[in-house]
Curated annotation (Swiss-Prot):
Extracellular side: 24-262
Catalytic function, reaction form: L-seryl-[protein] + ATP = O-phospho-L-seryl-[protein] + ADP + H(+); L-threonyl-[protein] + ATP = O-phospho-L-threonyl-[protein] + ADP + H(+)
Modified positions (Phosphoserine) in chain numbering: 458
Gene3D superfamilies assigned to the protein according to its UniProt record, in alphabetical order: Gnk2 domain, C-X8-C-X2-C motif (3.30.430.20), Phosphorylase Kinase, domain 1 (3.30.200.20), Transferase(Phosphotransferase) domain 1 (1.10.510.10)
Pfam families recorded: PK_Tyr_Ser-Thr, Stress-antifung
UniProt EC number: 2.7.11.-
Protein name in UniProt: Putative cysteine-rich receptor-like protein kinase 32
Ranges of the Cytoplasmic topological domain: 284-656
Length: 656
């Protein structure tokens, strides 16, 4: 027994000693080149992490850079921390990681410095990832072993910790005080990062508790830290985490219970507090009700005050929504150029009153876009819900849409050769790459898995440098982390860009966006709309069929837009056509993920698989059976045979 205790003490002291040498955990599995792009990005994101965390209620995650030089970082402070104290703690933790982990691609630190804060960075996204290793055990050398009835202490310790474990998952944070053990108490704090589930939080904390029981049983204080959770226990208060926790009175010497008067006083105080709290909440709700939509489901919008614009400001910015400021028609409404009082140019999207499902699309767009931050996505600046108006305010993107440059002015039926000539092969290739990065962010790197469901040329805006920005999230759907596909009774989007499983069965997933992106790649290469190919040959009339024929005839270069013939790289063009055909394969499982597409575009040494036949491939118009074809598109057999997917009609939704 003595030997076992001695080994436990030795184990704990060694762990503590190591912990005091370095509070940071530098993961030594991968390294980066000092002073390179990754190192620059690391300094950039960590130097701004403290201000981002302290200004965002104590929690922030984000990324900087592209490709292999991209770095992800997360920071948090425990709830209720003063912003200045949080900022100081984050500064110390960030600086410590930079100094003590000179070239590791993954490091983390739980810092106890007046408060508890956490910093982690990595070369791969970890925001929703359950990481239980590596572990740090750090303790208080001065606390020592519990002096008293060790069996009673251990029993109380285990019961108390198990009780906390069952509660911590709901909020990811818990600080509590145990019942008395003689004159002693246990002060325990548990914290998980927000990205993991409640069950994962409980699992991580439980693993820390087991580690204490196996190596450090009986010690009064210490901490056990993992990349996604933190556990500390001690014999006295710390970090100001227990200031609001009421202290229980010591047991009465004569063993009598608390007096009736004391109980009545406590009950009356609690009742008064609850009544006052209810009154405050009712008054606040009434004051703010005119600014928010009445919630109907759990998915309805919750709107931060900083995003709200008043109607008069937007009316003045757009000169009362004058025709001269009209930029065009977007999904479910008209878009106007505006100038805010601070001289910021904006695009103001005014939802039309007869837009059918517009209200839901409006809320959908606000909820989703407000959470997204990526250079290849149009940034949402705010919204307005006054006077029965529903308005979205976006950053202004000066060069209109990709559709305008590739296919011309739809209203005037004109194609300006000077506009098309601005899209040389280098720019088109960069546009394909930018859209890839934007979709990769939506599908994989954002906090939610988001499916756009309406990827097409008119929803790709071009900034002043002709960089693409994905726009119009009215059709978008967000998925849980563990969800891979869904279905809908109402098929929405643009025909010609929809995959077969969506058109016929209403099933959609990230592979739906991949299919649409494949069609868009082929349009960018050839400079023609998908719907313009029904006159070219005897096929059923779409771009996918035309490209598949050229591919099988070993003549893919016949697809190239004459405007880029002299400037294009034939190898890259063929590779893009190949990737486009992989994206439009009939079976979703055959289509590559956006992460794979990104690798295919950036690494020419990757061998591409042979594409399978695409969806909506028609051999000859005369072979089409009206009944079969109509039913495949989800139409009544009484409908006439559509020659293009763009002209098909499944619902009364007007293609945008």
């Amino acid at each position: 027994m003595c030997l076992q205790n001695l080994l436990s003490i030795l184990c704990f002291v060694l762990a503590i000693s190591f912990g005091y040498v370095s509070a940071q955990k530098c993961v030594d599995s991968m390294f980066f080149r000092p002073n390179g792009t990754y190192d620059t990005n690391r300094h950039l994101i960590l130097s701004n992490l403290a201000s981002n965390v302290s200004s965002r209620d104590g929690y922030y995650n984000g990324s900087v850079g592209e490709g292999p030089d991209r770095i992800y970082a997360l920071g948090l402070c425990i709830p209720g921390t003063d912003p200045k104290v949080c900022d100081d703690c984050m500064q110390i933790a960030s600086t410590g990681i930079l100094q003590n982990c000179p070239n590791q691609t993954d490091s983390y630190d739980w810092r106890s410095q007046k408060t508890l804060c956490f910093v982690r960075y990595s070369n791969s996204s970890f925001f929703n990832k359950m990481d239980l290793e590596p572990t740090m055990v750090i303790g208080d050398l001065n606390s020592g072993l519990f002096q008293g009835d060790l069996a009673a202490y251990t029993r109380t310790w285990e019961e108390f910790m198990n009780s906390m474990i069952t509660r911590v998952g709901r909020t990811r944070y818990l600080a509590d005080i145990s019942p008395r053990i003689g004159s002693a108490r246990i002060y325990a704090l548990m914290q998980c990062i927000r990205g993991i589930s409640s069950m994962e939080c409980e699992t991580c904390i439980r693993d820390n508790v087991r580690m204490y029981q196996s190596c450090c049983n009986g010690f009064i204080g210490g901490t056990i830290r993992k990349p996604v959770c933190f556990f500390r226990w001690d014999g006295s208060e710390y970090l100001g985490a227990f200031g609001d926790t009421p202290s229980l009175p010591p047991p009465s010497p004569d063993g009598k219970t608390i007096s009736t008067g004391a109980i009545v006083a406590v009950v009356v105080s609690v009742v008064i507090f609850v009544v006052l709290l209810a009154l405050v909440l009712v008054i606040r709700k009434r004051r703010q009700s005119y600014k928010t939509l009445k919630p109907k489901t759990d998915d309805d919008m919750t709107s931060p005050q900083s995003l709200q614009f008043d109607f008069m400001t937007l009316e003045a910015a757009t000169d009362k929504f004058s025709r001269n400021n009209k930029l065009g028609k977007g999904g479910f409404g008209e878009v106007y150029k505006g100038m805010l009082p601070n001289e910021t140019e904006v695009a103001v999207k005014r939802l039309s009153s007869n837009s059918g499902q517009g209200t839901q699309e409006f809320k959908n767009e606000v909820v989703i876009v407000a959470k997204l931050q990526h250079k290849n996505l149009v940034r949402l600046l705010g919204f307005c819900l006054e006077r029965d108006e529903q308005i979205l305010v976006y950053e202004f993107v000066p060069n209109k849409s990709l559709n305008y440059f590739l296919f011309g002015n739809k209203q005037k039926h004109l194609l300006d050769p000077t506009k098309k000539s601005q899209l040389d092969w280098k720019r088109r290739y960069n546009i394909i790459g930018g859209i890839t990065r934007g979709l990769l962010y939506l599908h994989q790197d954002s906090r939610l898995t988001i499916i756009h469901r309406d990827i097409k040329a008119s929803n790709i805006l071009l900034d002043a440098d002709m960089n693409p920005k994905i726009a119009d999230f009215g059709m978008a759907r967000n998925f849980r982390v563990d969800q891979t596909e869904d279905n809908t009774r109402r098929v929405v989007g643009t025909f010609g860009y929809m995959p077969p499983e969506y058109v016929t069965h209403g099933q959609f997933s990230t592979k739906s966006d991949v299919y649409s992106f494949g069609v868009l790649i082929l349009e960018i290469v050839c400079g023609k709309k998908n719907s313009s190919f029904y006159k070219i040959d005897d096929s059923g009339g779409n771009l996918v069929t035309h490209v598949w024929r050229l591919w099988n005839n070993d003549s893919p270069l016949d697809l190239i837009d004459p405007a880029i013939e002299e400037s294009c790289d034939n190898d890259k063009v063929i590779r893009c056509i190949h990737i486009g055909l992989l994206c439009v394969q009939e079976t979703p499982v055959d289509r590559p993920e956006m992460s794979t597409i990104f690798q295919m575009l950036t690494n020419s040494s990757i061998t591409l698989p042979v594409p399978r036949p695409p969806g909506f491939f028609f051999r000859n118009r005369s072979n089409l059976d009206p009944l079969t074809y109509g039913s495949e598109l989800g139409q009544s057999s009484s409908k006439s045979i559509p020659y293009t997917i763009d002209s098909a009609s499944i619902t009364r939704v007007t293609p945008r």
